[in-house]
C-alpha cells in the first residue's frame, strides 16, 4: 500500500509555481494577484482563507483579502464582486463558502467573471470543462487529477466510482475521470445517498473517490483488493482526549481500508493540501490568459 502524499506533492507544485513567478519578475511583468472575499467569521473558512494568503506569500503572488460582515446584503456582496471583476490588477478571485442564509450562493457564484473564476464554479467554466474546452477546473478535483498523474496511477479502462454528487467535487470528478486523456478514460459510476446496495457498486471499483462528509463511511469490506482510494472528506469529530477537543477524520475507515488498498490518501495530508496549490495554479493560468489578452489588445 502506497500513501498518496498530498502534502509533499503540494509543496512540489508550490516550488514550481514560485519558479514561474521568478521568471515573470525577470521579464519585468506583473506577478499573479489572487483575491478572496470572506463573509462573516466562520472559523473553518477563516483558517482556509488564511492558508491561501500564506500560500500566495510563499510563491510570490500578490494577495488581497476582503472581509465583509455576516449581515452583508446580497446586493452589497454583488457590488463587491463587480468591483473585483472590473479591477485589472486582480487576475483571479474566490468567494469563500459557505455564505449566510440571506444570500443566494448560486447567484453570487454566477456573478464572478468566468475569466477570474479560479475556483471553477461558474456555469461557463463547468460547461467548458464538460466539453473538454479550456476552462478552470475546480481546485479539489484538479488536485485529485494531479495526484493520480504524479503517482502515475492508471485510469484508462478502469472502473471509477465517485461517492457524492456535489458541484464542488463529485459531479466534476465524474466528468473528468470519463474524459479523453490521462487521467481519464475511465468507466464512471456516480453514486449518492439514494444509491441502493452501494457496497455492490464499490466492491467492483478500481478507483474510489469519496466526498460525502460522513466519517468512516467507506469500510474495508466495501472495497476490492488493490483499489485506489481518494478520500476528500474532512470532518471535526469531538474527542475529549484530543488536545483541541476534536480529531480530523475523513470519509474512509483508514485503518481497515488501507489494509486492502494499493494507493490511499490520508486525512489530513492527502487531498486537502492539493486544493490550495491547485487554486494557485489556476491563478497562474488566469494571469497568463489575462496577460495574453492585454498583449493581443495592443496589436
Swiss-Prot record:
Output the Gene Ontology terms for molecular function.
Answer: methenyltetrahydrofolate cyclohydrolase activity; methylenetetrahydrofolate dehydrogenase (NADP+) activity
What is annotated about its quaternary structure and interactions? Answer: Homodimer.
Q: Which residues form the signal peptide?
A: none
Protein name, please? Bifunctional protein FolD
Family the UniProt entry places it in: Belongs to the tetrahydrofolate dehydrogenase/cyclohydrolase family.
The record's keywords, sorted A to Z, are: Amino-acid biosynthesis, Histidine biosynthesis, Hydrolase, Methionine biosynthesis, Multifunctional enzyme, NADP, One-carbon metabolism, Oxidoreductase, Purine biosynthesis
One Pfam entry for this protein is THF_DHG_CYH
